[in-house]
Amino acid sequence: MKLEIENAVFEYLKKTLNRDLSAMLVRGHSTTLRPVTYIVVDCSEPKPFGTLSAADGLFELVLEIRIADSAHDIDYRIQQKRVNAVFKALENFECSADGISVLSFEFELDSDARDDDNIGDVLKYSVIAQI
């Protein structure tokens, strides 16, 4: 389910964002695979919702969208435009993964992020999905 939701969000952003932002989307979690500037979709492992068991088929996940640029020459006005565009695009997200129904897709927070020589934002969403 993790990979299916990651892929669904990735493909949704790929078709929804403008060409420049869409070109920044990368797959994978290794920093060596990421060109700067980048946008990465990362989903946590699903865990059964509340006190339910996995057999009940209702899961909660955390989805993070990382939007980063070089810490050496980031333009924060442009970075904020990127963040706003991704946030706006996800307002109407509907999961297209077969056999998975996203029941709730709620924005939780925007925080800063740093890795290697990059700096940026993380948009965090709470996801409840059913299989």
Region locations from a protein language model:
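Charged, amphipathic alpha-helical segments and their flanking helix caps
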Residues: 1-22, 29, 43-131
